[in-house]
Regions:
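Extended alpha-helical targeting/anchoring segments
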Residues: 1-256
Length: 256
């Protein structure tokens, strides 16, 4: 049984563009990592979101999502939005506005007994994203990596593992533009995910991974000289804080 009836979702439709509906299950036999192994067999785009509180304690929820409704990435002002088999490429100097525009389609209410995160963008913003916030900053493209400036996936459904109550919430956001059709679709998706949760997980055989030699993008001499320059800038008052970094890379022959 879902947490909200069709009539309750319709009541939200006047003020919200989407409503998260959910089914509650017991989590006594399923773990986030175990379910992730099942997800990997059916989807190539997925995430597991964990977090710590006070740097030492696991937070209450673990989130898993798969099959995003949209993928959005950008590098050097050239962006691409992919939804299903359709892809659109465009140039942008302000990708944050595009992200806000997309999220405006998902104005959702906070639903009692559900976590605050019930869907949205998941991904990363790289260091080079700063150039969109400060146009005066120019990065050396010759030293750039192959990573995108940002790479995001938009999820309208996810699975939340509640460690406190030992429960699982299967959450699907119902768009309110065609609420009856979308509510029925959400029911089907929730039932399908519940069936996935009930699938037995076969443990993978243990394999030892090999980590190659760790390399820096700077020599020790260059790094030390750069730190000395940073200290001089601070002494002269040109800067009050500088976070200097170097990039480390290594070959890895397994699946992270």
């Amino acid at each position: 049984m879902l947490n909200l009836s069709l009539d309750e979702v319709k009541a939200y439709a006047a003020d919200y563009t989407a409503v998260p509906v959910a089914k509650e299950c017991f989590a006594d036999m399923v773990t986030p990592l175990g379910f992730l192994a099942t997800v990997k067999n059916s989807s190539s785009d997925y995430f597991l979101l964990e977090s710590l509180e006070n740097d030492e304690n696991w937070s209450r929820y673990s989130f898993i999502g798969f099959d995003p409704v949209l993928k959005l990435r950008c590098k050097d002002y050239e962006a691409e939005a992919v939804s299903g088999s359709a892809a659109v490429k465009f140039t942008t100097v302000d990708p944050l506005e595009k992200i806000k525009e997309i999220l405006a389609e998902y104005k959702v209410p906070a639903i009692k007994n559900l976590p605050l995160f019930t869907g949205g963008f998941v991904g990363y913003f790289g260091y080079d994203f700063y150039q969109y916030c400060e146009p005066a900053i120019k990065f050396d493209k010759a030293k750039a990596t192959d990573f995108a400036d940002f790479d995001l996936m938009l999820f309208d459904k996810l699975i939340a593992f509640d460690k406190l109550k030992q429960k699982i919430y299967i959450i699907v956001n119902v768009k309110t533009d065609n609420v009856e059709v979308n509510y029925a679709r959400a029911e089907r998706e929730i039932n399908a995910i519940e069936a996935m949760l009930n699938q037995p997980v076969k443990p993978k055989p243990f394999t030892r991974a090999n980590l190659g030699k760790i390399k820096s993008n700077q020599s020790r001499e260059f790094y030390n000289n750069s730190i000395a320059r940073c200290r001089e800038y601070i002494k002269k008052g040109d800067a009050f804080q500088i976070v200097y970094s170097q990039r480390f890379t290594a070959e890895y022959d397994s699946d992270l």
